[in-house]
């Protein structure tokens, strides 16, 4: 048996990943040293780095397929560079076409986008070493050898730990759920300023991170479910994923305007108790995340029962003291929702809960991957238009790399291909991401050069520099996704050490700085002037997608209030789409903050609209969390009309404003005349409809304000 500390490190995926990188780099440095051909270290190491940057999670058969596709793309990219390099005009044409083609390949999904990036990277790595070997095929074969070496280690790791990446994704899901619940608990803080929207904005951004993690987990599950559904481990992970989705729906639910709660119960302990309970549930999700990583059974905290008992007692005291009955009923709905989350966590390890439902539709996952040649062509052809952000980015990157190549040809820079390498890493689809990377890239390069020159001076031995090369390579991958400036510093050190093997370490230091500055300048100019993808111009389209997804989510919930509760695939797709669109809107609004030409009025309107949309989705989520079959025809008819009205109010033309207002007044009048049964979910349905329609006038006003933005704002910076 492993000790708890040893088990923690044995099952720590980050350490396992770093160990794989370490072994791979040891191989690419030790083998050439053993052969006495240290020059071979450069293509082997660069090929290994490119392979590691394009590593994709999949089952064994999928990994082998990815490896074949990756090696094919790598060879085509590298061999094309070698063959066309002597003819600049042909090379420029090939660079343009291949860059556009590889980037458009990303239209098939993230898997192909990652492979395409690796192919472009291996092409530029080939440009850096065209003078190393006499024959055109030598460097491509060595680069591929480095890539194969890394993938062999990856396959061995997969055979030893086949479901580890899936467990990591599941653990991250519950970690993000914990953060979301903690932020949601702050909405019950009675001391928050009434007009402050910052907590809701933070909650919307956290929802975006959570949805990205859930989507990644779904992809990991899909790759393993094919032909593997009956295994106990698969049932367990699928069950954990469905529980995470259900908890997210309940956690994102809102049953009342929080400002109303603070106004009435600011001096009561009930808000603190709800806040503490949600915080405890966040801690439980965090504990569950750790249990998944360590492969330990989760033990539910027995203190939850006492917390629920105390909240029940607090609500009873408030009832005795004459608190408003409607608010107490709302708090009762909220408490029932939290009890359902508690029940999910308490029973997550039970064998009965992990048994897949007999209805196959309830344990299916939506497969968004391309199927067949016709589907592949359809997905690609959608991006053959300037309306596609991917098409614009493909054209932009083609021009960026060609312009960098032209500078090299005109100036005769010996190491100028680092300009292309910098532009490839820095130039992102939108201005905000590019500006952020640009600054970090420059800082990392300058610090790397400042550290690297003394290192080359004080460590002149070949063996010492090979050891440092391995260390800097491992540190690059360790910081790649958390500290981009640190990662750039370490990759700069790695490059200096590689070229010092040829005796050019000091010679390439200054060109590396100059090329980085030129590459960053080209990338900045490209995202600012070549079809600039300003996020504020995407706001009307993102808002439309969010409102349409919310309407589909409402329709799916309405169907279940008529037919009864289940977790069929269509319902889960509608729910996921609504939260995904909300996350996209949050990303757009966040990226707008640093863009030029966005007026304070538009920025404020977008911020308010994001908060309203997230609140709107949370009101719908409450309807979904409590969904069950209703039998009262009057309530069902009211719900039908309310859902139709919401769709109409979100999509009507300005000329129909008067008709929409009349429909709203009629709906409010009907709502006041309803008599829902207190012992059913009917009061909650009426309450949530009231909350939804109360938001619609302000959402409509901001929609009209935002829709006018593209016509009033200049295109370029």
UniProtKB/Swiss-Prot annotation:
Q: What UniProt keywords are attached to this protein's entry?
A: Cell inner membrane, Cell membrane, Membrane, Transmembrane, Transmembrane helix
Instruction: Give ranges for the Periplasmic compartment.
Output: 1-10, 54-66, 110-112, 164-398, 463-465, 511-512
Q: Which InterPro entries match?
A: Integral_membrane_YccS, Integral_membrane_YCCS_YHJK, Memb_transporter_dom, YccS_N
Question: Record's GO cellular component, any one?
Answer: plasma membrane
Name the domain of life this protein comes from.
Answer: Bacteria
Q: Where in the cell is it found?
A: Cell inner membrane
Q: In what way does this protein cross or attach to the membrane?
A: Multi-pass membrane protein
Q: Coiled-coil intervals in this record?
A: none
Q: What is its main location?
A: membrane
Q: Does the keyword Transmembrane apply?
A: yes
The keyword Cell membrane appears for this protein: yes
The residues exposed to the Cytoplasmic compartment are 32, 88, 134-142, 420-441, 487-489, 534-717
Membrane-spanning intervals of the chain:
11-31, 33-53, 67-87, 89-109, 113-133, 143-163, 399-419, 442-462, 466-486, 490-510, 513-533
Q: Which Pfam families match?
A: FUSC-like (PF12805), FUSC_2 (PF13515)
Entry similarity comment:
Belongs to the YccS/YhfK family.
What is the name attached to this protein's record?
Inner membrane protein YccS
What is the scientific name of the source organism?
A: Escherichia coli (strain K12)
Gene symbol?
Answer: yccS
